[in-house]
Amino acid sequence: GGSFLLNCEWTTLEALEKELPAKMKNILAKKHANLYVIDAIKIAGQLGLRGKTSTILQSAFFCINRQIMPYESENPDDKNTAVALMKYMAYKSFSRKGDAIVQMNYNAIDSAKENLVKIEIPASWATTKEGAPMVKLADNDYFKNVVAPILALEGDKLPSSAFNADGSVPTGTTKYEKRGVAVLVPEWNIDKCIQCTQCSFVCPHATIRPYLVADGTAVPEDFKTKPALQAKGYSFRIQVSPLDCMGCGVCADVCPVNQKAAADAAKTGAKVDPAARALNMVPLEKLVAKEAANWEYAQTLADAPKDVTAKFADVKKSQFSQPLFEFSGACAGCGETPYVKVLTQLFGDRMIIANATGCSSIYGGSSPTCPYTVNKEGHGPAWANSLFEDNAEYGYGMNLAYKARRNALKDKVAALAEKWSNYAEGKATCEAWIENMDDAEGSKTAAAQLVKCLESCKDCGCECDELVKEIYKEKDCLVKKSF
């Protein structure tokens, strides 16, 4: 007999029959719930409060639950109703922002009653097996065996043996969730895009990215591209992941083309023509099938050469580097995560993070998924968080330990260079690593060459075997880390 309020665009029984999962229908019917729906997202947009649904939903809650307190009164002087108290709090909270903002919130409170729809639950829902189908889980053992049960609120059923004894968890698991929570997602207008990559730069969730496709590459029919600026021999595309997008609209807001279109329209008082914009926020259903497939294809594209995408050259080029922080659980439009994302684009393949407890520990390390991921070589950030609010000391200790390990490793590599006096290539490789060990890019090249030499020698049976194996065991320290 309880009441269930659902914020969705499906405000008819017919729509709910199609969109609700069978299990949810079964539970609602068996519990004899009073089902109410309201499209708070649409209402908020109409009122100029895009994405701000809490006031509408709170008003709807009190409208449904009048046994808690009177919802409204015919007496305008009655201050003890839900509507009067909510409006009082709206004025108290927003009056410093101006009368227009206060009135928007008043309108949001008043809109709930007139837009609330009660759905009579049919008896057939108690046993039905019809409804929205379950999404197929990603083909990843850890996600299927550990993450999915936790997301389904069945984590208590997992044995302790399902987890690593040291508490570490695999990275790069948010990409398997594909939550599809956005109501509106950006649609790329290929004709208007100026290829500035600002949309990617500001995206808090790394769900919209630029891609370069080498000329002559066979691409799917729907994967439209245009000649790339400043990248001869390549075509350009902006691709969104509709099922990972949070629908915040920051990309569309920052787009210079969109801003110009808005300014031009303002001069005449006309509405902005969608055709004049490079990014338009459109319903998820319009794009999801086509763009989800395009996103999956984009992940198979080869990385563009570094001379084309020199990530330290400028902001635009930095966005062609793979973000190693993606699809976090941060709030839609988060202002922190774009910085974290860009850091991983610049330094992520050698990053070690001593995290400070706060939002960054929630969107960065919430169980059961991890937004930090790896590149195609398997390199990415290592992340840890201390709950003692001592991340400076925590990170300092990591750095001291790392330096001690590297200094010891340097001595071992120097000793190996002496032992390899008759192995010219190996000796030169050891010396090259020692010379470049404190240079970020130089140590990458030298480390890769040294590992090849170590792998060719570690089981050859010579007197260097033990030393080679010791160095190889600590190959994670060969590339200079960024703390």
What are these regions (language model features)?
Residues L16-E17, L47-L49, G249-C251, G365-S367:
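Short conserved micro-motifs at the rims of enzyme active sites and ligand-binding pockets
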Residues G1-A148, A218-D222:
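Active-site cofactor/cluster-binding pocket
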Residues M86, A90, S95-C245, A252-S482:
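Ferredoxin-type iron-sulfur electron-transfer modules and their immediate structural context
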